[in-house]
Design a protein with these regions (language model features):
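Sequence context surrounding c-type heme c attachment/ligation sites in exported
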Residues: 90, 104-244
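Aromatic- and Gly/Pro-enriched helix-to-coil junctions and flexible linker segments
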Residues: 1-3, 7, 11-15, 28, ...
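A cross-family structural signal marking well-folded subdomains
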Residues: 2-140, 151
Length: 245
């Protein structure tokens, strides 16, 4: 009976034990359980700490819980006008908010945030700790959100090493792979959604320039009231791309 099934599902979701189910589901689906698999470079991302890490995870879990509890449209997974923040995470997102408790926050229409792929936890697990990976993020979008996973790469294709010295951008590094015939067809699908997220750094902060440990200009940013000297402002970020029609 459809009504009986619906009542039983609602009963289970209303139980506090369902929080563990949601946590486990998100760990498997989005890979949130891998958030500690990489450690952000302390020189490039000195602001990353456990308080920020905890807030990142809480945002995604509370966001998904809200979708379930309010029976909201799955469109919110791609683009939403709200999220959950506390002071620490809001600061990371360039927003102002008081208090350490996570609360529901409305997002402005011109905000770069909205949906799962702009949440710091997801952006963190789709990076390697030092640099972003348009390939990894593009794969994530195609596989986890669109259900159209690309083919595995050829076995003889080497890995892409990040350049933190500010001499080459990720786009320039990836160009070599796109020029290989056996790679080109997949990269035409993978790269555009991956590059669309290139304005978000490995810990989910919004950026217009890459951070560099070598070349670049001194940053005007501050960390806890002191000037940041650990990194410089490197090349400009290019988040452009075009998907196949």
């Amino acid at each position: 009976d459809k009504k009986v099934l619906e009542n039983q599902v609602n009963r289970m979701l209303d139980d506090k034990k369902s929080n563990r189910f949601i946590d486990d589901f998100l760990n498997q689906w989005l890979g949130l359980g891998e958030i500690d698999a990489t450690t952000p470079d302390e020189k490039l991302f000195p602001e990353y700490d456990d308080n920020l890490r905890q807030a990142m995870l809480s945002e995604t879990r509370l966001f998904f819980r809200e979708l379930v509890d309010k029976n909201l449209s799955p469109d919110n997974l791609i683009d939403s006008n709200f999220t959950f923040l506390n002071r620490r995470l809001a600061e990371h997102y360039g927003l102002q908010l008081e208090g350490e408790q996570m609360v529901k926050v409305s997002l402005a229409g011109n905000s770069p945030r909205g949906g799962l792929m702009t949440q710091a936890s997801v952006l963190k697990v789709t990076s390697n700790g030092v640099a972003t990976s348009p390939v990894k993020r593009g794969n994530f979008v195609l596989d986890k959100l669109l259900g159209t996973p690309p083919s595995s790469p050829p076995p003889d294709i080497g890995s892409i090493e990040p350049d933190t010295r500010g001499t080459t951008t990720v786009r320039e590094t990836l160009a070599a792979h796109r020029d290989v015939e056996s790679c080109a067809s997949c990269h035409r699908k993978i790269d555009p959604p991956g590059f669309a997220l290139e304005s978000f750094d490995p810990i989910g902060g919004y950026r217009t320039r890459y951070r560099s440990t070598g070349r670049g200009e001194k940053t005007k940013r501050q960390l806890r009231g002191r000037p940041i000297r650990e990194y410089r402002e490197g090349p400009a970020v290019d988040a452009s791309g075009m998907t196949e029609s």
